[in-house]
Design a protein with these regions (language model features):
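Flexible mid-to-C-terminal extensions adjoining Fe-S/redox cofactors in radical SAM and related proteins
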Residues: 1-25, 262-303
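Short, flexible, glycine/charge-rich loop motifs used to bind or transfer phosphoryl groups or to couple energy/partner
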Residues: 29-31, 71-74, 127-129, 251
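Core AdoMet radical
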Residues: 38, 46, 56-67, 78-92, ...
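C-type cytochrome heme c attachment motif
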Residues: 49-53
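Radical SAM enzyme [4Fe-4S]-AdoMet core and its adjacent flexible, acidic
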Residues: 133-288
Length: 303
């Protein structure tokens, strides 16, 4: 496996590999990071897909966040990873932004809905951006695994991960994806915006699907090349109960706000996570100033 970089962050040595794998090493009992290893960056609320459970309330008339003029982008450390939502219609300044991040050695991963991914113009854009090393990883939010030649098309793109939501994705969808050497990311269900409305009238469906995921997890893991989870899914699926202390230490990537945090370019705020009720204005802050605010709030027990 090709190594991209190794760097020191606080008391931790981080190594990045070509396939997206990240390793942390420290001689101390706990990892302590001076700067954020990664950020989840919401760049747009404009999307024509209309998912019933969208936690961000995206719509065709939603606004794009500006991608220029932010001091925190200018001050990001090399090899910081950012995950951005790439929706249709795309922001007009997305390509200059990707080139800017590339020059700063910031690693950009994108999430795109399957309906958009299957469009020829979107796949062409992604293919060219990946070839130029402007985008490292692609997360595809699943809508219908049986669509056209979806699975074979996905496998043409390196470092691609299928994103599914606990409570939304059905057993039939997962079964159809099994056995194709795919990577799967399971996200927790967020009861925000349309996600709350959907849960209010479909809570039985959501909870039954979460229970099914939890009970069939071993079989699901065996059906994919890699299965990973965000922190909310880890909580909803009670993953800590399945692991002993040593396994948990190796598996768990860290609490929200200790190694990563959330940035919303549409609203111009940042927070510990996208679920956090407490937000802070970005203003003219550097990335390290933002991360320090999040870490200090964690120490005080805020949020």
């Amino acid at each position: 496996m090709k190594r991209i970089a190794t760097y020191k962050n606080g008391n931790t040595y981080t190594t990045l590999y070509e396939d997206g794998t990240k390793e942390h090493f420290t001689m101390d009992d706990d990892f302590k990071f001076d700067f954020a290893e990664s950020c989840d960056v919401q760049i747009s609320q404009c999307c024509d897909n209309g998912c019933e459970w969208c936690y961000y309330g995206c719509s065709p008339t939603g606004q794009h966040g500006k991608l220029t003029g932010w001091k925190f982008f200018e001050t990001m450390h090399p090899y910081t990873e950012i995950a951005i939502n790439l929706q249709c219609p795309m922001p007009e300044d997305i390509l200059p932004f990707l080139w800017k991040m590339h020059r700063q050695k910031v690693i950009v991963n994108v999430t795109v809905n399957q309906n958009h991914f299957m469009r020829g113009d979107v796949r062409e854009f992604l293919g060219e951006a990946i070839a130029e090393d402007l985008i490292k990883g692609v997360g595809i939010s699943l809508t219908n695994p049986k669509q056209d030649d979806f699975i074979n098309i996905v496998k043409q793109y390196p470092n691609t991960v299928i994103h599914v939501i606990a409570g939304v994705t059905s057993p039939e969808d997962i079964d159809y994806l099994k056995g194709h050497d795919l990577k799967l990311l399971i996200l927790g269900y967020k009861k925000l915006e349309r996600g709350k409305k959907y849960y209010d009238h479909s809570s039985t469906i959501v909870e039954d699907n979460i229970k099914w995921l939890e009970s069939d997890l071993d079989e699901i893991i065996n059906g994919f090349k890699v299965v990973s989870f965000d922190n909310l899914a880890i909580e909803q699926l009670h993953l800590k109960d399945r692991l002993d202390e040593k396994e948990w230490e190796m598996f768990y990537g860290g609490d929200d706000g200790t190694v990563t945090f959330f940035i919303d370019l549409v609203k111009g705020v940042f927070a510990k996570s996208s679920l956090s009720p407490i937000t802070y204005p970005i203003g003219d802050k550097t990335i390290d100033e933002m991360f320090k605010i999040i870490k200090d709030a964690n120490k005080k027990g805020s949020d």
